[in-house]
A protein has these predicted regions:
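Bacterial N-terminal signal peptides
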Residues: 9-18
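Bacterial N-terminal signal peptides that target proteins for export
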Residues: 1-10
Length: 398
């Protein structure tokens, strides 16, 4: 066991748990005394704070860069700019384009913790490392998306390779940090042990390597860079809070996808409690919630006439506002990719601004209150009412 990881996790859980009771609530002072916030994105309660998470194989147009420059926090996902040459080249080109328009925007480079997604300039070097790719018990190489393999961070050389690529990107002034994905695949043992048929010893080595890699990332990168992870999930015993000591915050997805026999309302309620604990300690929250199904109904992206879209956007925004604190950002998402391989628009909200982001919000007057599955919260210009059992949210603007 990685003892440094174990003890840091215990301290993190204790600190985060202590934040659940906010006496003398003041949203402007929740981060006081924590330090290290100079590297964080700009934040304002004037309107609902926005996050952007996107990829596009081709280069972004000038108009698209103008649009992206509006966001305080942006992650350029895997496949960004692969038609430019590599993910690294494409990410840097996009980041520099945004920075010329908005130097204050914070831009994150996407790094997967175990998956060697195609298009990366670093993959060539990985292939030269003996045993770099994870094998199943029968000697085969497990994959995701049919052909994409997993690298073995249980090996010191693979961890060094991972750090080298991250360091090279973080050394560029246009990159402000990294977003680390697929942590859940390492932490939920059923994925590698049962789905991918990896042996017990190999899996334990992978988990030990994960702890060692987090320690390296924390020591070498976090002083000057934002380090986010896809780490908060209600399915985990502590919701992922026991790992947040290694990160500046969490990207959130699959928030409503209940597993393990837990009811959907209870799963969402645990997620809310977990995110609140993290946000109240000044962690960055990049909250994504899907609205694809609502867009498929009615009149698509016409917010005024599509009742399903209107209801879904209000519900997801209410979920966000119930958990939000300073450095929380919201992204209602249709898709991360801008266009399909065939060149068709894949994200129907691309280059659009939903009406809720144009309304004045104002600072929260206090934390959310909870009564069963009903949550309420008051902001200067908005009253939030949320029912997670019936999945209804109401925003009353004034």
């Amino acid at each position: 066991m990685n003892l440094h990881l174990f003890f840091k996790a215990l301290v993190t859980v204790a600190l985060l748990a202590s934040s659940s009771a906010c006496v003398g609530y003041d949203a402007s002072k929740l981060n006081a005394g924590s330090g290290g916030y100079d590297k964080y994105p700009e934040f304002s309660w004037d309107h609902i704070p926005r996050y952007m998470h996107v990829w596009k194989r081709a280069a972004f147009t000038e108009e698209e860069l103008d649009y992206l420059a509006q966001f305080p926090l942006i992650t350029f996902e895997k496949a960004t700019g692969v038609q430019v040459g590599s993910v690294q080249q494409g990410t840097l080109k996009a980041a520099r384009g945004v920075k010329t328009r908005n130097p204050d925007a914070k831009i994150l480079y996407y790094k997967n913790i175990v998956i060697d997604w195609g298009g990366s300039a670093a993959s060539k070097e990985l292939k030269t490392i003996e045993g770099a790719y994870l094998q199943s018990k029968d000697g085969s190489y497990p994959t995701v998306s049919r052909t994409t393999q997993f690298f073995d961070i249980g090996l010191p050389k693979v961890r060094a390779w991972w750090m080298k690529d991250a360091r090279r990107m973080l050394d560029d002034p246009s990159i402000d940090g990294i977003l680390i994905d697929a942590n859940i695949k390492v932490l939920v043992d059923g994925f590698f042990l049962r789905q991918k048929k990896v042996g017990d010893e190999e899996y334990q080595r992978l988990k030990d390597g994960y702890g060692q890699l987090l320690t390296q990332i924390d020591a070498e990168f976090r002083a000057d860079n934002i380090v986010l992870a896809n780490i908060i999930r209600a399915r985990l015993e502590h919701g992922g809070l026991n790992y947040l000591g290694y990160f500046d915050g969490s990207y959130l997805e699959a928030f409503e996808h209940n597993v393990g026999g837990v009811s959907r309302p209870d799963y969402i309620a645990k997620g809310i409690e977990t995110v609140q604990a993290a946000a109240r300690q000044g962690k960055i929250v990049a909250f994504t919630l899907g609205i694809k199904e609502a867009l498929n109904q009615g009149n698509g992206g016409d917010f005024d006439s599509n009742e399903a879209l209107h209801a879904r956007v209000n519900y997801t925004a209410a979920l966000f506002l119930i958990v939000a604190e300073k450095y929380s950002y919201f992204f209602p998402v249709d898709g991360m990719g801008v266009v399909t391989k065939g060149g068709k628009l894949a994200n129907r909200l691309w280059m659009q601004t939903l009406p809720i982001f144009k309304k004045r919000l104002g600072a929260p007057k206090g934390p959310a209150t909870k009564d069963g599955y009903i949550y309420t919260r008051e902001f200067e210009h908005c009253s939030v009412w949320l029912d997670v059992e019936n999945e209804v949210g109401t925003l009353t603007w004034r």
